[in-house]
């Protein structure tokens, strides 16, 4: 009975505190929260669409209570600018739940670190050492190796009789490029052979990534109401097991590289070698090195494949745009060689298509939460210290106040007006902005552009037999990142000489 009374008293105290807080502050409008759980069970599976719908009713800034935590969601470019520029310093911390706390070793990485000396240090490592133009250029042959390997696989499979009518599932090929590219950049290892078979270490890597996404996407009551966690001990065990599994694999790879560096007395350009070389100079702990490596993997693997799949779906759905891109290829690159990243600057319409794809289909449509480290006002409303603020990037990109015909896929809009997408224009924010803008934005843009351009230069893409372009399912799957609900299927017809469909291997 005493435990029951304590529980009742605790609940009453929490409810009373929240009521007093709501009388004291002027919060943004939003759906009415329920006691204890807030709006947790009002949120629909595709979260960013749910918040967009609520914004249509309540306005471009809304309150969403997840448990006892206030989450403020903004859905306009003007308010995004307030969050990411005008009040950037007060909103530069991160909210970490149990999964991200475990993943980041209490914020010892970059993505989940609070703003402070540690964040400034590891951000400096990323911008001055890891994602420099020089290093990205030195790693370019890896990217070109992987996209040409993809072209070779598509060419082989599209000529099989059983695929000529039903087409190919593009996700398989794009996922292989993203997987091989990020593991080679981060770890210097290609876990997948030429036949697409993944080795034992690679299977473990993929399992860790998949399990981490499942844990990270949790909306369970225990994840958001800390004082109920004792009721879910299995969750704590799952987080601990996942962290140990990830660290075991990463330490083994780090040890391999340490031994290789000792034998060769030199470091390669892979990120693991760079971080091990910089360890003493920047005073990087093992937890920070592991955290940074996995930040790059989680931020750079699925997101690139997802964006490229959406872009290709738009090409199949909009044959006019596909044809216009291919006409530009034929003028600039021709039909007697394969294109390279050096060609991108001479392909303005291709760049517009990439921008339009990022606008309509940002890989992380709901920006990772910024936590307030002080009381702040956004849009005239009070945001108390400790609140979470989200920018609904997907909604901002569909705001008719700043985009003409926002739901239309029309790359020409970027020929009419040059819009930056690396954090300087708050209408287009696929990589965030301000202090927490993604340091690897250019790498992501290069890889998506490379995957897309090679597929379009080498092949004409049409829907499977019996499917009309307008029948392609353009709905999203629930999750932190936006996979297409139905993987896009398409028929590939080669358009270049057959000797241009071979992989250009690079051993590094």
Curated annotation (Swiss-Prot):
It is a single-pass membrane protein. One of its GO terms (molecular function) is p-coumarate 3-hydroxylase activity. Heme binds at residue 438. Its cofactor is heme. InterPro entries: Cyt_P450, Cyt_P450_CS, Cyt_P450_E_grp-I, Cyt_P450_sf. It is an enzyme of class 1 (oxidoreductase). The chain crosses the membrane at residues 1-21. Disruption phenotype: Dwarf. 91% and 97% reduction of the levels of scopoletin and scopolin respectively, but increased levels of skimmin, the beta-glucoside of umbelliferone. Altered lignin composition and increased susceptiblity to fungal colonization. It is found in: Membrane. Cytochrome P450 which catalyzes 3'-hydroxylation of p-coumaric esters of shikimic/quinic acids to form lignin monomers. Can use p-coumarate, p-coumaraldehyde, p-coumaroyl methyl ester, 5-O-(4-coumaroyl) D-quinate and 5-O-(4-coumaroyl) shikimate as substrates, but not p-coumaryl alcohol, p-coumaroyl CoA, 1-O-p-coumaroyl-beta-D-glucose, p-hydroxy-cinnamyl alcohol, cinnamate, caffeate or ferulate. Has a weak activity on tri(p-coumaroyl)spermidine, but none on triferuloylspermidine. Hydroxylates preferentially the 5-O-isomer, but can also convert the 4-O- and 3-O-isomers with a lower efficiency. This is Cytochrome P450 98A3. It comes from Arabidopsis thaliana (Mouse-ear cress).
